[in-house]
């Protein structure tokens, strides 16, 4: 039996699956694990080219999750597939995405924070297997993010830019 040790950076329990969780690593892979099978992982997901700093389960769809990485991108996943559903990256971003959070009110809205101080609010539409639209609002702020119910979000920012239909 081959064992592999990877440094974990983040973990998240899947919504609706209390015995399963996702763990991100410095090696750029995500492991789906079970509390019942502690000696091995259930699935491995590879799609990032650097450390994965955060994983967040979608609060509305139990099989959807989001990751952010040092490779300048956020990726949308379905834990039933081994490759990402989509990748989100600003055209002018050349820095690590260090934090992400889903909106508590909308199933297709999330925010990301980058190492250069920008906060990006992403909105996407996926209908009948086709990506219809992706929009990004970029705010330059400080690091860290937490979105509270009813969109309570305090930020200090210098400028804002909307990038429609990336």
What label would you give each PLM region?
Residues 10-18, 37, 55-63, 100-107, ...:
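Loop/turn segments within WD40 beta-propeller blades
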Residues 86, 98, 104-158:
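Structured C-terminal portions of repeat-based eukaryotic scaffold domains
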